[in-house]
From Swiss-Prot:
It is a multi-pass membrane protein. Changing residue 71 to Q: Decreased N-glycosylation. The gene is Slc2a9. Disruption phenotype: Conditional knockout mice lacking Slc2a9 in enterocytes are born at the expected Mendelian rate; they show no obvious phenotype and are fertile. Mice however develop impaired enterocyte uric acid transport kinetics, hyperuricaemia, hyperuricosuria, spontaneous hypertension, dyslipidaemia and elevated body fat. InterPro entries: GLUT (IPR045263), MFS_dom (IPR020846), MFS_sugar_transport-like (IPR005828), MFS_trans_sf (IPR036259), Sugar/inositol_transpt (IPR003663), Sugar_transporter_CS (IPR005829). Residues 1-34, 110-120, 171-181, 234-297, 357-362, 419-429, 481-538 are cytoplasmic. Belongs to the major facilitator superfamily. Sugar transporter (TC 2.A.1.1) family. This is Solute carrier family 2, facilitated glucose transporter member 9. High-capacity urate transporter, which may play a role in the urate reabsorption by proximal tubules. May have a residual high-affinity, low-capacity glucose and fructose transporter activity. Transports urate at rates 45- to 60-fold faster than glucose. Does not transport galactose. May mediate small uptake of adenine but not of other nucleobases.
Length: 538
């Protein structure tokens, strides 16, 4: 009896017969979500991407109080009020330095991740969050606004590390059948973080002049929760196998995350990839940019991350309060209505996580950007005609909520998933460095340039973002392959024709397949290494 017959016999024993195969398949699908896998995703995201989202929105509510703090500190030091231009500059630095810190954190990920691993990188990263929380929370009592600015920078470093290390960790611990859904947890917790920042910023909670420092101090809570919980979970099994060559540790990690004792199939798949890459060192950013086997994967990641930041979602927040005001909503009620935007974000992200393994990455990404372009165009029209009829401002509100929902249902989380899926183990840290650099530089560019675009074009600025969304959707339609339920080798093959170069692991994969069929000895991977060497990858 060959291996396929044994597998079929085992399946029939588990399900009771051929007629119950589909039932057994469904049972195995539900077993993919083990308790340890769920805890790792929730705890990892709560102490990482949640904090990123929280720090995006937390500065909005206390803005007037922080500016008053800056002015008061300046007066005590210099004996005169701060110049308005200087105050604007200080506030711009306070907001935008978060992105600079994120870029620094992204550049640190490869070095830290190589020596510490994915899980330990997340644990060490909590040190940045705790120190930032203490600095920002104590800035008012110390009478030093520089502490708030430095804290924002350190919090940016935390975000840069988190948005690279967390997707890598989730990608490497999840079965490919639920890789997209688990990866979407990153985006869901970003949205929950944004909503939490809006909620805690209400005057009834922490959004008052005497309590605004505590808005920044609560950052310490998710960091402490992650520090207390994550050590009890294993390291990424792929990291243990590829970097530490710890097969026993990798097997235990697979058993923990998959919730079953027999992980021979998963371990063999990882070992097969490990044999191909066993003599390959970690690829540098420059080497990855030069590699012909991944040229279009790199281009796609760059365009995906640039579209993620430049699609105009951040610009929506600049118009929200004015649009709500023109719709007749009292000024003191606008913060409560703004909570609806955070709620829509969270619900749309959860929806995406539920359907991503059914619909795939391509439809959600293309459809999300396409709908954003449509609603940006409609929003431009309603803002231009808002004085023509009393109901037009309400249509603007609908457009804003629709843009947010369209973004979070696809473009808001899929870029992080694709970055992990496109690249093999030795390339993944460099790929996340490239993706993170584009992400944070684009974030900084939007914060720096949007006020000038808004001043020049007014409401027509949304046509710029509509154009970017259309360009992104068009690119993904023609270039992006579906990655749902595909292995790395299959995804590489999907790009091979466009790259005009076969991925180096294909020869070894083919050889190993032939070996299993003919019971031959394991092929040497020297041909693979030669192929990498000829193309200057190693």
């Amino acid at each position: 009896m060959d291996s396929r017959e044994l597998a079929l016999a085992s399946l029939m024993c588990d399900t009771g017969g051929p007629g119950e195969l589909s039932v057994g398949h469904q049972q195995r699908r539900t077993k993919k979500w083990s308790f340890s896998l769920v805890v790792a995703a929730l705890v990892g995201a709560f102490g990482s991407s949640f904090l990123y989202g929280y720090n995006l929105s937390v500065v909005n509510a206390p803005t007037p109080y922080i500016k008053a703090f800056y002015n008061g500190t300046w007066y005590r030091r210099h004996g005169q009020p701060i110049d308005p231009d200087t105050l604007t500059l200080l506030w711009s630095v306070t907001v935008s330095i978060f992105a600079i810190g994120g870029l620094v954190g992204t550049l640190m990920v490869k070095m830290i991740g190589k020596f510490l691993g994915r899980k330990s990188t997340l644990l060490v990263n909590n040190g940045f969050a705790i120190s930032a929380a203490l600095l920002m929370a104590c800035s008012l009592r110390a009478g030093t606004f520089e502490m708030l600015i430095v804290g924002r920078f350190i919090m940016g470093v935390d975000g840069g590390i988190a948005l690279s290390a967390l997707p890598m960790y989730l990608n490497e611990i999840s079965p490919k059948e639920i890789r997209g859904s688990l990866g979407q947890v990153t985006a869901i917790f970003i949205c929950i973080g944004v909503f939490s920042g809006q909620l805690l910023g209400l005057p009834e909670l922490l959004g008052r002049e005497s309590t605004w420092p505590y808005l920044f101090g609560v950052i310490i809570v998710p960091a402490l929760v992650q520090l207390a919980s994550l050590p009890f979970l294993p390291e990424s099994p792929r990291y243990l196998l590829f970097e530490k060559h710890d097969e026993a540790g990798a097997m235990k990690a697979f058993q923990t995350f998959l919730g079953k004792a027999d992980v021979s199939q998963e371990l063999e798949e990882a070992l097969a990839e490990s044999r191909v890459q066993r003599n390959l060192r970690l690829v540098s950013v420059l080497e990855l940019l030069r590699a012909p086997f991944v040229r279009w994967q790199v281009i796609t990641v760059i365009i995906t991350m640039a579209s993620y930041q430049l699609c105009g979602l951040n610009a929506i927040w600049f118009y929200t309060n004015s649009i709500f005001g023109k719709a007749g909503i009292p000024q003191d009620k606008i913060p409560y209505i703004t909570l609806s935007t955070g709620g829509i974000e969270t619900l749309a992200a959860i929806f995406s996580g539920l359907v991503i393994e059914r619909l795939g990455r391509r439809p959600l990404l293309i459809g999300g950007f396409g709908l954003m372009a449509l609603f940006f165009g409609t929003l431009t029209a309603t803002l231009t005609l808002q004085d023509q009829a009393p109901w037009v401002p309400y249509l603007s509100i609908v457009c804003i909520l629709a843009i947010i929902a369209s973004f979070c249902s696809g473009p808001g989380g899929i870029p992080f998933i694709l970055t992990g899926e496109f690249f093999q183990q030795s390339e993944r840290p460099a790929a996340f460095m490239i993706a993170g650099t584009v992400n944070w530089l684009s974030n900084f560019a939007v914060g720096l340039l949007f006020p000038f675009i808004q001043k020049s074009l007014d409401s027509y600025c949304f046509l710029v973002f509509a154009t970017i969304c259309i360009a992104g959707a068009t690119y993904f339609y023609f270039v992006l392959p579906e990655t749902k339920n595909r292995t790395h080798a299959e995804i590489s093959q999907a790009f091979a024709k466009r790259n005009k170069a076969q991925p180096p692991e294909v020869k070894a994969d083919s050889a190993m397949t032939e070996e299993k069929a003919n019971s031959q000895t394991e092929p040497d991977s020297s041909s693979t290494l030669d192929s990498y060497g000829q193309n200057k990858i190693v």
